[in-house]
Amino acid sequence: ATTMAIPFYPCSHQQGHIAAAAWSAGRMDLLDRPHLVWHLSGGTTELLHVVPDGVLVKATCIGGTTDISAGQLIDRTGKRLGLAFPAGKAVDALSREAAHRDSFRVKVHDASFSFSGLENKMNALAQQGTSPADICWFVLASIIQGVETATRQALEQYPGLPVLCAGGVASNQLM
């Protein structure tokens, strides 16, 4: 930054995801006011309450998974189905070929939930011979259901706040 005479803002990995998501959504204005952010990546599934903090933002976790992340579940699904790692793009593409569009109701309490039951159900479907496309749809639709329910619960506590999604998992077509 010094060599190029540009500002340097030290930030966390999470703050970087939040800023990148705001920029790519064309909503840099969100960084100047409170909002909610889903950080959905390979290792993180967190619902954050974000407030301005000087030139950066401060994020407080208010929900998300209590065990494995959405990205881990998607990659485990891909591995189970023999797909390449990381499996996000392949699971996303395969889900669009699903003939049966079922989902699992993820139990959400205070905007928090667990994906271990969903992982067990995915493994059971694979053992039963369910088509890979149907399994991919099932997993993604179930993740989305959990995220949507947690978002609704959080908006009861933080009414009217906009919601932004950040991270690689958030880029799938169903999301």
State where each predicted segment sits.
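Short beta-strand scaffold segments in enzyme catalytic cores
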Residues: A19, V37-H39, T45-H49
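Short beta-strand-loop/turn "lid" adjacent to the catalytic site in phosphate-handling enzymes
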Residues: A1-T2
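A contiguous, well-structured pocket-lining segment that forms one wall/lid of small-molecule binding clefts
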Residues: K89-V163, V169-M175
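Glycine-rich phosphate-binding loop plus the immediately following alpha-helix
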Residues: Q15, V51-E97, N120, A124-G129
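Conserved phosphate-binding catalytic cores of ATP/NTP-utilizing and phosphoryl-transfer enzymes
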Residues: I6, P10-L36
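Short glycine-aspartate micro-motif
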Residues: H35-H39, D67, L164
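Solvent-exposed alpha-helices and their adjacent loops that cap or buttress functional pockets
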Residues: S24-D32, V37-S41, D53-G54, E97, ...
